A protein has these predicted regions:
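Active-site pocket-lining/capping segments in soluble small-molecule metabolic enzymes
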Residues: 1-152, 158-301
């Protein structure tokens, strides 16, 4: 067991394309008013995919912002841009998709950008065609077995591996990892999915089929409260939830430094709440709200 304490948490945020306008407002604030935000955290990457990407997975992408504008914003603030191409059902004929290849070629130009992948077929293709990209093993693999998770961490193909959220509190096994292994682990902090769900893979496969344009019924969640959709208050009670205080007081001390926030399929108001909860000091949250949207004339009803 190695325990080199980390001093900085790197957050990996949702909505590269989906919430481009929100980040255009938030990132200048994050740079110019660092006193608003925790000194022990930064933004490691922002991930996502535009609408109608065959290689997409996890969630149905949306957002029609120009990819060059999206990438330029990330470069301006020194943030890695990640394409979420985690479709688990890709076949050989899908590898020639022009839209996805153009995006990879663009992100490959500057270096420092990555792709979140599930399919080994796609991984090998990307390694051969876009050598400047790094790769993240997607949480859509639903790695709940600690042995499988360790095998994935040990794969040289991946810079980061996102385990299933149900491994988040398996501290005995997590603490047994080497420092090099800990550096590759990226915890999913705010999952709302039922902790005992057995249909998680089926849910992700349904999204993969939709991105491929296949005709299929929607996946109907049968978990308790599944009809309520995502609620942050509910996610906070999930046994796998990792709070900002957990990160600062537990995970950094254990030697972990990478933390993923989900939410590509949600609304921008909820994404802002995540940014407030995880990155912003409580006494400055009102300042961030006022800078982003809140003024004296705003009506809710």
């Amino acid at each position: 067991m190695e325990n080199a304490q980390n001093d900085m948490a790197h957050f990996h945020l949702p909505g590269l394309f989906e919430f481009h306008e929100l980040y255009r407002a938030f990132l200048p604030l994050f740079r110019e008013h660092r006193e608003y935000f925790y000194s022990w955290c930064d933004i490691g990457s922002i991930y996502g995919a535009p609408a109608d990407c065959v290689w997409g997975g996890g969630r149905l992408g949306f957002g029609d912002n120009d990819p060059r504008e999206v990438l330029t914003l990330m470069q301006e603030y020194g943030i890695s841009a990640r394409l979420t191409f985690s479709n688990s059902l890709l076949r050989e004929e899908h590898l020639s998709d022009k839209t996805c290849n153009r995006l990879c070629a663009l992100f490959n130009e500057t270096g420092g950008n990555g792709v979140i992948v599930h399919s080994d077929l796609l991984l090998e293709y990307l390694k051969g065609h876009y050598p400047n990209l790094y790769f993240v093993s997607s949480t859509t693999k639903v790695l709940t077995d600690s042995r499988q998770f360790l095998d994935e961490v040990n794969r040289e193909d991946f810079r980061y591996v996102v385990p299933d959220f149900r491994l988040n509190k398996d501290f005995e096994k997590l603490n047994a990892l080497t420092n090099a292994q800990k550096d590759k682990v990226e915890f999913l902090c705010n999952e709302c999915c039922w902790f005992d769900c057995t249909d998680r893979k089926k849910c992700y496969e349904n999204v993969s089929r939709k991105n491929l344009g296949e005709s299929c019924e929607d996946h109907h969640c049968t978990a308790p409260g599944g009809n309520e959709g995502y609620r942050f208050s509910k996610a906070m009670t999930n046994p796998g939830f990792i709070s900002a205080q957990d990160i600062r007081n537990i995970y950094l001390h254990m030697g972990f430094s990478n933390f993923k926030i989900e939410g590509r399929g949600l609304g921008s108001a909820l994404i802002l709440e995540f940014l407030l909860f995880f990155l912003t000091k409580p006494e400055y949250q009102i300042h961030v709200r006022e800078a982003i949207y809140l003024d004296s004339m705003l009506d809710l009803f």
